[in-house]
A protein has these predicted regions:
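Short linear motifs embedded in intrinsically disordered, charge-biased segments
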Residues: 1-189
Length: 189
């Protein structure tokens, strides 16, 4: 197997003051703070840049479907189903590994409301509350699960899948280490 030094990038986490110079065939690897891998943004931070990137991609997909949202011959329930299958699937890609903060949860809810308002053709100037928008969505489709709930459910499903498996992923996720401590009070060093 050959490793290309031009294509290979180096990303590190929490390495302040540590020399991270790696060479392949006397060529130094480029150190980066973020890169795209399989459609996901990998960064040396938490998952906020990835979630914001997914939100931007979702908004772009929503705008590309504007002729569908403005078409009066398509029923409202069909538009919601189209949004769920075409738009939110972009957002939910790899959501199982996200770290959700309170700020990011609010942003996810706001983005979902923006999508529904775009479909319903409701402007913020119309002063329609989020509860009224949710009621209209609930009327159109009976079983409605908001986006944040879907993300949380997928995270739990993924955790259950990994915790039932045997192997390195389970060991890393649960932080279990082979061995143990001796009984009694531990010695001071």
């Amino acid at each position: 197997m050959k490793i290309s030094a031009e294509k290979t990038k180096l990303i590190t986490n929490n390495t302040s003051g540590i020399n991270t110079e790696i060479k392949i065939n006397d060529q130094k690897l480029e150190a980066v703070t973020s890169f795209k891998y399989l459609g996901s943004l990998i960064t040396d931070e938490e998952s906020k840049p990835e979630i914001l990137s997914r939100m931007a991609q979702t908004t772009a997909a929503l705008k590309r479907l504007k002729p569908v949202w403005n078409d009066r011959s398509i029923s409202f329930s069909s538009k919601i189903q189209l949004m769920r299958s075409l738009v939110t699937s972009i957002f939910l890609y790899a959501c199982e590994s996200w770290i959700l903060t309170a700020e990011l949860q609010k942003r996810i809810q706001a983005m979902e409301m923006r999508c529904y308002r775009k479909i319903l053709n409701i402007s913020y100037k119309d002063h329609v509350t989020n509860e009224e928008v949710r009621a209209k969505i609930q009327q159109a489709i009976r079983a409605h699960e908001d986006l944040l709930t879907i993300v949380k459910r997928r995270k739990l499903q993924w955790y259950g899948h990994v915790s039932r498996s045997l192997g390195l992923a389970k060991t890393i996720l649960q932080g279990t280490v082979i061995g143990g401590r001796r009984q009694g009070r531990q010695r001071k060093r």
